[in-house]
């Protein structure tokens, strides 16, 4: 199938509120994952023994953000960039990312008073080269993905100018990532494969923005909710991930995901196992016309169930609480799919509530970490399950308020001053 990269843009751009719901859900999963880690950040004197409510979907959420970013950029720039439009493109991208990021960086420096970074590290963050030139400040650790975003935005410029097919560029990016990951131990540079594999996700969103038409009738909200529950489940119920990992070892004779001591934010070869899930979620949330959408969703729901067999055969789960939440989410994903008609009203209500969160999702994603670090330094009112619960509530409220102020007050003011 020949993918047409540049088509005549639609005369009317319709804002997709369902995508806002997806953004909101992904950002909530990131902050929930960070808040529920057993590291005494939320409550310095208490950490739950059986942390059954922790989810490890933060990394998956970032992958979804990358796919979403490529998709949105593709919709916003259906025509090739020219020397007259590149400046405006760069300006819009920087204004969208940098002002909020810079304010959160200042807050992160305040939160780092016990482990203040060096001037070189601060300079690396100001220039957004952290993770490449300097270590990443823990109090703003989610910022690693913003560096990826900036690089992807820059790489989009030649793709657009020269009308390159993003599908072919994605395949080339996979090859570059695999070759460099294979020889990573020889030349000691795991950065390139990480960016290459991350770019595959971004390009996949760009491809999706150029292909498939929108359905005449929208996809049921129950399917959207099923996708979100499935997204929560697949980090622990990772049979597709494990299968892909083993195929990779069989093909290359080694684990391409094991590089060197590169730590925060690395995107590895094995993450490609989640690319089909990310794409299917985006297809469903954008009402794309794809053959056998329902059957494909059912297949993706069924695959993780083989994880239970693997756990049973190898007796890997000594602490059953660790799979309680993923199993519950998995059951809800299947129920929303199987009983779509019965849960449609409730699913529509929940998705529309998440739409409101999507408008502050970037602010939530970047500001919650400095707030969490600040809370870890407050020792009063801590040490019990009750204080933990109250602190969790305060953390969520503070993060939402800060994100609202950044997105709805500060960002519009900055745009007004710079345009």
Q: Predicted regions span which residues?
A:
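Membrane-cytosol interface segments of multi-pass membrane proteins
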Residues: 1-187, 213-224, 279, 341-363, ...
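C-terminal ends of transmembrane alpha-helices
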Residues: 40, 131, 177-188, 233-244, ...
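Extracytoplasmic catalytic-loop and juxtamembrane helix elements of membrane-embedded
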Residues: 48, 119-129, 195, 243-261
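Membrane-interface micro-motifs in multi-pass membrane enzymes
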Residues: 59, 140-148, 194-199, 267-277, ...
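Small-residue-rich segments of transmembrane alpha-helices in multi-pass membrane proteins
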Residues: 96-100, 201-205, 229, 304-305, ...
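Hydrophobic alpha-helical segments of polytopic membrane proteins
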Residues: 162-175, 204-231, 292-307
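Loop-centered beta-sheet repeat module
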Residues: 180-207
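Alpha-helical transmembrane segments of multi-pass integral membrane proteins
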Residues: 235, 239-409
């Amino acid at each position: 199938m020949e993918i047409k990269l540049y088509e005549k843009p639609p005369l009317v751009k319709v804002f997709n509120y369902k995508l806002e719901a997806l953004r909101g859900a992904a950002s909530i999963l990131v902050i929930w994952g960070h808040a529920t880690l057993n590291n005494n950040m939320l409550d310095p004197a208490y950490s739950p023994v059986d942390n059954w409510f922790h989810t490890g979907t933060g990394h998956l959420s970032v992958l979804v953000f990358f796919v979403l970013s490529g998709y949105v950029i593709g919709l916003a720039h259906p025509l090739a960039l020219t020397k007259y439009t590149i400046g405006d493109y760069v300006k819009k991208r920087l204004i969208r990312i940098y002002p909020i990021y810079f304010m959160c960086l200042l807050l992160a420096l305040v939160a780092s008073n016990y482990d203040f970074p060096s001037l070189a590290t601060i300079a690396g963050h100001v220039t957004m080269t952290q993770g490449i030139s300097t270590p990443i400040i823990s109090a703003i650790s989610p910022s690693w993905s913003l560096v990826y975003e900036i690089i992807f935005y820059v790489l989009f410029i030649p793709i657009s100018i020269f009308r390159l097919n993003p599908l072919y560029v994605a395949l080339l990016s996979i090859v570059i990532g695999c070759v460099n990951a294979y020889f990573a131990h020889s030349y000691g540079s795991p950065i390139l494969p990480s960016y290459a594999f991350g770019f595959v996700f971004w390009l996949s969103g760009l491809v999706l923005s150029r292909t498939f038409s929108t359905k005449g009738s929208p996809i049921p909200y129950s399917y959207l909710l099923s996708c979100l529950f499935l997204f929560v489940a697949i980090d622990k119920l990772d049979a597709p991930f494990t299968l892909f990992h083993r195929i990779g070892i069989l093909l290359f004779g080694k684990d391409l995901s094991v590089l060197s001591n590169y730590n925060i934010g690395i995107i590895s070869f094995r993450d490609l196992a989640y690319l089909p899930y990310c794409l299917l979620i985006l297809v469903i949330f954008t009402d794309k016309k794809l053959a056998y959408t329902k059957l494909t969703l059912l297949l993706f729901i069924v695959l993780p169930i083989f994880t239970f067999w693997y756990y049973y055969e190898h007796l890997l789960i000594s602490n059953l609480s660790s799979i309680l939440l993923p199993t519950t989410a998995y059951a809800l994903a299947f129920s929303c799919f199987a009983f779509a008609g019965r849960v449609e009203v409730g699913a529509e209500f929940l998705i529309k509530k998440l739409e409101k969160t999507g408008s502050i999702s970037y602010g939530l994603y970047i500001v919650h970490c400095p707030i969490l670090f600040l809370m870890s330094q407050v020792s009063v009112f801590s040490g019990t399950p009750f204080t933990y619960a109250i602190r969790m509530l305060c953390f969520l409220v503070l993060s939402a308020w800060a994100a609202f102020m950044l997105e709805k007050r500060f960002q519009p003011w900055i745009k007004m001053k710079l345009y």
